[in-house]
Structure formats: structure tokens, C-alpha cells
Amino acid sequence: MYAAKGTQAYAQIGVESAVMSASQQQLVTMLFDGVLSALVRASLFMQDNNQQGKGVSLSKAINIIENGLRVSLDEESKDELTQNLIALYSYMVRRLLQANLRNDVSAVEEVEALMRNIADAWKESLLSPSLIQDPV
């Protein structure tokens, strides 16, 4: 029992240290990794009929999408990509809420595929510094 709590404490410190020293681009990458991890876990919990695990994982994914990825976008922007991402994130949240209510693994997998495409595009853009704009 004590060892598990100690391990969790060290893991939490490691995450906090990584966040504190990360660039904005690395933070967004961490958000993508976190939401994808939560979605994979939600699918597995749904397949195992683990309602509590499913709920916790879907809540985490929704929280990251709404309070991490979506709020980092400028909703007042007229940029088409920004507006499309805002709409897509809203769609993903709706699908995850439906997945939770209906125990619909395919909805979680749909959101995971969409998110993986966005995450892959983001990570690819990091390899081309000319594609990354500095925040204003």
C-alpha cells in the first residue's frame, strides 16, 4: 500500500516537472497524448463492462478536449482551421457523451481516430518549424 502511494507521488512529481519545463508545443503534444490514452482506456473498460473505469476515462478525455485543447484556440478568430477545430472538438465531446450513455465503443473509436489524425498532423507540423506560428 505504502509503495503504491509513493510510486504515485513520484509519478505526479515527474508529470509536474515535465509540464513546468515544457514549451507550448510540447504542452499541446502532452494534451494529445493524454486524451488518446484516456480514449484507449475507455474502450478497454467498455469492453470489460467496467462502468467506473469507463466513466473516469471518458470524463478525463472530455476534460482534456474542452479545457485543454479547445480553450487554447481563439474562438474569435476568423481563421478557417481554428473554427473547424472548435467545431470538431465540440462534435467529439458530444460523441463521447453519447458513447457514455449508450455504452458505444464505436463512438469512442471514432473520436480516437479523429483525435489521432489531428495529433499526428500536429506532431508532423513540429518537424516543419515554418508551419508553427508564434502566439500573439
UniProtKB/Swiss-Prot annotation:
Sorted UniProt keywords: Bacterial flagellum biogenesis, Chaperone, Cytoplasm
Keyword Calcium tagged: no
Gene3D superfamilies: Flagellar protein FliS
Regions that span the bilayer: none
Single GO biological process annotation from the record: bacterial-type flagellum-dependent cell motility
GO CC terms, sorted: cytosol
Domain of life: Bacteria
Subcellular location(s) per record: Cytoplasm, Cytosol
Keyword Lipid metabolism among record annotations: no
SUPFAM superfamilies associated with the record: Flagellar export chaperone FliS (SSF101116)
Signal peptide positions on this chain: none
Protein family: Belongs to the FliS family.
Protein's name in the database: Flagellar secretion chaperone FliS
Organism of this sequence: Escherichia coli (strain K12)
